[in-house]
């Protein structure tokens, strides 16, 4: 891995703890519209930040952490087991398979798949239903707080564990091999070191 790239990585907060917690604790409802590919943290950020996730028919997700020799971040290890169950979460995190939009809805990781041309308008309309005068903003904020606040300590701990793992893995031969293999467009040959 290039030294100038490694110099940009803050080893103290690779999992983006502060960012993830800030998004998760946002009082106002947040809606996400995914209109194409969402790889790794791009999707897990939506899990942390969004109250509702809507997908274009063209959207898909890949969680390539293990294929790169790194650990999941942005709370992936916190959210996925709670949303999917432990074994399904492990399957998604261990194997970098492409997950199409309909499968994401079936798994409970998104709310709906929409025609690409209708995605943003639908998401906007749903957002308008959550704010005054159509939505009871105080009620929604109170319910969101009641659902999220008990989880903050656990999420914080999971992010600490992700940071610890990422700090070690970024110095590993497997990480270097994962990145090199991706750049060279070949399958990685991990050594476990």
What do the predicted segments below correspond to?
Residues 54-59, 110-160, 173, 187-193:
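C-terminal long alpha-helix characteristic of the crotonase
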Residues 96-103:
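Acidic, divalent-metal-coordinating active-site segment for phosphoryl/phosphodiester hydrolysis
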Residues 1-22, 38, 67-69, 150:
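Glycine- (often His-adjacent) and acidic-residue-rich active-site loop
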Residues 31, 94, 110-114, 167-171:
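Short, well-ordered beta-strand elements within core beta-sheets of diverse protein domains
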Residues 16, 77, 86-89, 120, ...:
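A general structural signal for well-ordered alpha-helical segments in protein cores
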Residues 48-49, 107-108, 185:
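Structural motif
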Residues 19-25, 33, 39-93, 122-127:
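CoA-thioester-processing core
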